[in-house]
C-alpha cells in the first residue's frame, strides 16, 4: 500500500467529507471557466482603455487559454513532487493574486503578463482537484461526484457573457478580475481545511526539454497570431515567429516520441481510433471556441451593440448546449456515436456559415435561434 493510501486523510471517504471536496473542486472549476470567458464581452472596452485594436486585445483571452493548455500536463508531476495540499493551495493563491494584478494593470503588456500568471494557477487547480476526488472516493461514488464537477463547465460559460456585459456597462472592466478575490479567499479557506496528504510516489524525471520546446513553440505561435491581428500587422516578424513555432513544435513532438517519460505521451496517437477522435474533436472545438469569442467582437465593434445586448445573445450559444445535454445519452443509444457525431458536425458547420452571414439588420430572434 502506498504512503498516501495508508494516510487516513486520503482514504476513500463517505458522506459530506468527499462531497465537500468535490464541491471545492467544482468551485475552482467554475472560477477558472468564468474567468476564461467573462473577459470576452469586455474586449472592445479593454482595447479602447489600453489603446490597442480589438483583435490584438484578444491576446488577453488567448494567452490565458494557451498557458492553461501547456501547463496542465505539468500538474500531475507537480502533485507527485510537492503533494496535493501544497499544489492546490499554491494554485488558488496564484490565481487569486494574479486576478488582483490583472485589475491593477496599467498597460497591455502588464495585463497579458498577469493573465499568463493567472493561467499558471488555473492550470493546476482543476486537474489536481480531480486527482484528489479520484483517489479519495469509492468507485461507487466517482460518477456522481464527477457530475458535481462537470456542471460548472456548463453553467460558467452560460452566465459569463451576460455578467461580463453588465459589469463592463455599469462599472470598469477591471471589476471582471476583482470578483475573483472573494471566490479565491473562500476557496483557499476551504482547501486549507479539507485537503491533506503527501505525494503518493516519487515522480519520474521532469521532461524539461519537452516543456521548453512545447512552451516556446506555442508562445511563438500565439505572439505571431497577435501581430497579425494588430491594426498595423508586422508581417515579417509574424512570419518568422510562425516558422520558429513550427520548428520548435516539430522538434518537441520528435523528442517526446523518443523519451521514456515525455511531457505528453504522443505514442497514444498511434491508436487509430484515438488519433481520429483527437483530430476531429480538435477541429470541432476550434469552431466551438471561436464562436463565443468572435460574436461579441462582431456585435460590439461592427454592429455597435452594447456589451449587455452582446453578452445576452452569446448566452444563447451556451443555453443550447445545456438544453441538449440531457438528451445526449438517449441520442447515442438510439442512433449510435457515428450518426450523432456526423449530424452534430454538419449542424455546427451550418451554424458557423450562418454566423458569417449575420448583419446588423438580422432579426435578434434569428440570431438567438442560430
Segments the model singles out, each with a brief description of its role:
Residues 94-104, 183-190, 217, 225, ...:
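Transmembrane-helix signature of multi-pass solute transporters
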Residues 1-17:
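Intrinsic disorder in cytosolic terminal tails and internal cytosolic loops
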Residues 169-280, 287:
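Hydrophobic transmembrane-helix bundles of small-molecule transporters
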Residues 72-209:
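Helix-loop-helix hairpins in multi-pass membrane proteins, especially solute transporters
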Residues 105-106, 138, 194-197, 229-230, ...:
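Short helix-capping/hinge motifs at transmembrane helix termini and TM-loop junctions
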Residues 46-47, 78-79, 163-171, 225, ...:
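Interfacial helix-cap and linker-helix signal at transmembrane-aqueous boundaries
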Amino acid at each position: 500500500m502506498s504512503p498516501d493510501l495508508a494516510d487516513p486523510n486520503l482514504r476513500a471517504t463517505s458522506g459530506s467529507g468527499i462531497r465537500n471536496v468535490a464541491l471545492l473542486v467544482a468551485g475552482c472549476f467554475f472560477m477558472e471557466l468564468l474567468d476564461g470567458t467573462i473577459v470576452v464581452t469586455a474586449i472592445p472596452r479593454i482595447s479602447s482603455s489600453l489603446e490597442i485594436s480589438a483583435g490584438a486585445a484578444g491576446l488577453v483571452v488567448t494567452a490565458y487559454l494557451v498557458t492553461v493548455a501547456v501547463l496542465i500536463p505539468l500538474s500531475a508531476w507537480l502533485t507527485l513532487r510537492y503533494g496535493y495540499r501544497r499544489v492546490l493551495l499554491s494554485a488558488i493563491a496564484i490565481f487569486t493574486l494574479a486576478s488582483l494584478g490583472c485589475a491593477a494593470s496599467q498597460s497591455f503588456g502588464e495585463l497579458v503578463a498577469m493573465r499568463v500568471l493567472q493561467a499558471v494557477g488555473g492550470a493546476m487547480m482543476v486537474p489536481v482537484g480531480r486527482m484528489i476526488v479520484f483517489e479519495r472516493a469509492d468507485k461507487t461514488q466517482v460518477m456522481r461526484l464527477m457530475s458535481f464537477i462537470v456542471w460548472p463547465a456548463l453553467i460558467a460559460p452560460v452566465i459569463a457573457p451576460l455578467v461580463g456585459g453588465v459589469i463592463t456597462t455599469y462599472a470598469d472592466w477591471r471589476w471582471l478580475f476583482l470578483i475573483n478575490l472573494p471566490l479565491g479567499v473562500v476557496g483557499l479557506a476551504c482547501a486549507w481545511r479539507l485537503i491533506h496528504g503527501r505525494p503518493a510516489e516519487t515522480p519520474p524525471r521532469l521532461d524539461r526539454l519537452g516543456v521548453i520546446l512545447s512552451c516556446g513553440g506555442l508562445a511563438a505561435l500565439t505572439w505571431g497570431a497577435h501581430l497579425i491581428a494588430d491594426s498595423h500587422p508586422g508581417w515579417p516578424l509574424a512570419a518568422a515567429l510562425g516558422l520558429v513555432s513550427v520548428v520548435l513544435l516539430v522538434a518537441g513532438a520528435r523528442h517526446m516520441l523518443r523519451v521514456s517519460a515525455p511531457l505528453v505521451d504522443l505514442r497514444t496517437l498511434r491508436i487509430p481510433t484515438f488519433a481520429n477522435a483527437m483530430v476531429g474533436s480538435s477541429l470541432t472545438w476550434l469552431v466551438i471556441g471561436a464562436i463565443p469569442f468572435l460574436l461579441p467582437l462582431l456585435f460590439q465593434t461592427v454592429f455597435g451593440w452594447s456589451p449587455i445586448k452582446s453578452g445576452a445573445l452569446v448566452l444563447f450559444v451556451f443555453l443550447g448546449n445545456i438544453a441538449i445535454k440531457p438528451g445526449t445519452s438517449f441520442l447515442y443509444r438510439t442512433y449510435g456515436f457515428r450518426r450523432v457525431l456526423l449530424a452534430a458536425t454538419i449542424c455546427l458547420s451550418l451554424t458557423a456559415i450562418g454566423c458569417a452571414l449575420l448583419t446588423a439588420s438580422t432579426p435578434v430572434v434569428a440570431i438567438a435561434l442560430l
